[in-house]
Amino acid sequence: MTKGFTQNSSTEATAGNYDASRIAILKDYNETVREVNPEAVVILEHFCDEKEESELAEEGMQLWRNLNNAYCQSAMGYPSNSDFTPLVTFGTTMPYGGWVGFMESHDEERTAFKQIAYGEGPLKSDINVRMKQLAANASFFFTAPGPKMVWQFGEMGYDVSIEEGGRTGRKPLHWEYLDNEARKGLCNTYAKLLKLRREHSELFNPGSTFSWLVKTANWTGGRFLTLAATNGKRLVVVGNFTAKPIEAITSFPVTGVWTNYLDGTKLHVTSIPTGLTIPAHECRVYINF
């Protein structure tokens, strides 16, 4: 809660305003930590003015980036307020890697719980559909460049409310989730996407070209993400968050053979753009390597 590292008084409404003295204090803390351990990772729960967060990031600190509401909305099947674009630093004053994005945290409600409580159609009642939608969420989370945080058991579709036993109450462990095929499938999707980031990190560095169409207006026709590394590696994500199959008009960067990284199936792209039939609540992660 580094927003409180200041001697200036404020209200709830003004606490996040730019504060040069707070920046100076946190820079001093950061420098002291790095004198002891130059490799230390300093992450702040700050949630302040972007100019202030940018200056802190320029000093090598990282700051939480809360996208819980957007990913909860998409998880429940609602296009309103489901814009993912604030997850990334592109088009902002933040240096690359300054934000650590998250879909869930200790302070926010579980996406899977909100599916059960408020989801649209089968997202409320069918665990197989819920896990597919959460896999689509993950595919548009981990393939976006920049650091990410995963809150515990989110990879299994943990659906116990944050209010269970009180907000800070002990929450039940559910390792048996992995005995459920749908939940295990979601966990495998997380693992594969993290492996992709680790083994092909050049796709996710500042030198790569990144674009995505993930705003509210990009709901009914499909959502898209494209990454192009300088070594020729390409990645294209196509997702359908709706309750019906769609014909997603997809602009692959090049023709040729593409592989769905999540299941290994091949796609021969002979023309650009290409129409792809994407079933309801599903996602494809295509690579050309």
Language-model-detected regions and their locations in the chain:
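Active-site-proximal helices and loops of the catalytic beta/alpha 8
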Residues: 1-108, 139-143, 154-233, 242-256, ...
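Aromatic-anchored helix/helix-loop segment that forms the rim or "lid"
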Residues: 113, 118-138
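Short edge beta-strand/loop segments characteristic of extracellular beta-sandwich folds
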Residues: 237-239
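Solvent-exposed beta-strand/loop surfaces of large extracellular or lumenal domains
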Residues: 259-273
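C-terminal beta-strand-rich structural cap/linker in extracellular carbohydrate-active enzymes
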Residues: 270-289
